[in-house]
């Protein structure tokens, strides 16, 4: 039984913000912002990476049902290539907070830096394993992106995206060198860029 984080730590109108998908070679970076309702506990919240896929899927539905407000946002591959991954992630986090139906009094951002926001914000290193609202955001972002990568695997078969979700595994790198990049591969990432830079013999 996974106990998860103490729901008593939930504060009124504090948004947790997290991202998933900074490291993959393809697909969007996905962010989420969540304001939890202190009167509607969600048991078992934790860093999405520490939960089984089945548990994440169940919590995904429960968070969306019980949270005071939530928003899932993204930055597309084109934006990642144009802005760089850090700036694209900050933009996607900004979109998630701005998309909330309730304005938070504070946004707690997983990591060590904050996007430009109209509300006060603070970074929390390893926030997804400390702050329930950030843990909830990590679950929404991960489940959303994982589902999308399964769909993209059907559109671009042969790369194994449903399995590795775009991360640079041996299977992915081998397929990339054999099949070449797809339109959803990030041209600014070295393994993809190097393939495109190879001169034709």
From Swiss-Prot:
Its cofactor is Mn(2+); Mg(2+). It comes from the Bacteria. GO terms for biological process: DNA replication, removal of RNA primer; mismatch repair. The keyword Membrane does not apply. Residues 12-201 form the RNase H type-2 domain. One of its GO terms (molecular function) is RNA binding. The keyword Transmembrane does not apply. It catalyses: Endonucleolytic cleavage to 5'-phosphomonoester. A divalent metal cation binds at residues 18-19, 110. Its EC number is 3.1.26.4. It is found in: Cytoplasm. GO terms for cellular component: cytoplasm; ribonuclease H2 complex. Manganese or magnesium. Binds 1 divalent metal ion per monomer in the absence of substrate. May bind a second metal ion after substrate binding. Keywords: Cytoplasm, Endonuclease, Hydrolase, Manganese, Metal-binding, Nuclease. Pfam families: RNase_HII. HAMAP family: RNase_HII_B. Belongs to the RNase HII family. Endonuclease that specifically degrades the RNA of RNA-DNA hybrids. This is Ribonuclease HII. The gene is rnhB.
